[in-house]
Amino acid sequence: MVTDIRITQDKNDLLSCLQLRRTVFIEEQNVPEYEEVDGDDPNCEHVLLTIDETPVGAARLKYYDNFIKVQRVCVLEGYRGQGIGSNIINFIINYVKENGIRQSVRLGSQTHALEFYKRLGFIEFGDEYLDAGILHKDMAYQIK
């Protein structure tokens, strides 16, 4: 089994990320398409994780002045619980560290995933809020 994780390099990689998001968010979690497809994708970097060349996980990186925001983290249902989400987040943290991109990594976690992100070193801040009808809470990871 060959696992590859990368910043998307071409249109096919991006299309794979968008299809993963459609499957997880629109089809599985019933997020309205108009909320999932928000027009920010051309202005973001995207992370794709494949196993034996099959796309199974993705995330989107949006840049702000002093932080990078991780968005749209998703793993196909049949691949969850195998460390793929952790691999994606750790890849992003290392990418940010190695490239000196920003001082912190932030994200809006669905509340059911808070413990997952805490185990990876993220800290909660702010109040819970609804995004696409799903409870979320902001979290941050300080780059050391």
Regions found by a protein language model. Give the residues of each.
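Conserved acetyl-CoA-binding loop-helix of GNAT-fold acetyltransferases
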Residues: 81-94
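Short amphipathic alpha-helix that is part of the acyltransferase structural core
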Residues: 1-36, 41-46, 50-52
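Conserved GNAT acetyl-CoA-binding A-motif
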Residues: 96-109
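Conserved beta-strand in the GNAT
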Residues: 48, 54-62, 67-74
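Acidic/histidine-enriched, beta-strand-rich ligand/metal-binding domains
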Residues: 78-80, 112-119
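Conserved acetyl-CoA-binding loop of GNAT-fold acetyltransferases
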Residues: 118-128
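C-terminal "cap" of GNAT-fold acetyltransferases
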Residues: 110, 130-144
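Short acidic/glycine-enriched loop/turn segments that link adjacent beta-strands
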Residues: 41-43, 66, 131-135
